[in-house]
Design a protein with these regions (language model features):
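ABC ATP-binding cassette signature C-motif
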Residues: 1-177
Length: 177
């Protein structure tokens, strides 16, 4: 973080020329008075706040997770659906794998069949690499460890604390650095 500043309209400066660097795997605490810019600083670091002056640089492949004080969750979804968002990449791969397998029941040329078999193999390798065959077990263990509400419960019916646990579960499954 090089020379980061943030001003809210009309002229409230909450961050002024901040320079920070972190060691790999360091645990960082941010303390300060109400309104001093703690949440804004964390949002800048997490990439949520994009309108700031200065430069934010991460090592290649480095990811940051942020659990907001009031997580924004889709009230029409179930606990399971929100938690699955944390593993969106592998969920998408598994979905495509199922679609490819369903296509085997359709009539096709030998060329199409060979392409389908090749794609199935690629997807299977990706699933193996991400340990995707164990996704259901992983989600259940994560939800259980955080004492999330039942997986079929609607988000709109959850308390604030339950919503935060669901959001935390989703965030941890994203495995940010």
């Amino acid at each position: 973080m090089n020379g980061v500043s943030k001003t809210f309209p009309p002229h409230k400066k909450v961050l002024s020329n901040i320079y920070l660097s972190f060691f790999y795997a360091a645990k960082i605490g941010v303390i300060g008075l109400n309104g001093s810019g703690k949440s804004t600083l964390l949002k800048v670091i997490a990439g949520v706040e994009k309108s700031f002056e200065g430069e934010l640089v991460f090592s290649e492949g480095y990811t940051v997770g942020l659990l907001e004080q009031e997580p924004k969750l889709n009230d029409t979804k179930t606990v399971r659906q929100v938690v699955e968002e944390g593993t969106a990449e592998i969920v998408a791969i598994l979905k495509e794998y199922e679609e490819v397998n369903a296509k085997f029941a359709e009539p096709m040329s030998d060329d199409e069949m060979n392409k389908l078999i090749e794609r199935q193999g690629q997807l299977s390798d990706l699933i193996d690499h991400h340990n995707g065959w164990e996704l259901d077990n992983k989600l259940e263990r994560a939800m259980d460890a955080l004492r999330c509400p039942p997986e079929d419960a609607l988000i709109k019916n959850l308390s604030r604390g339950e919503r935060r646990r669901v959001a935390l579960c989703r965030l941890l499954l994203q495995e940010p650095d």
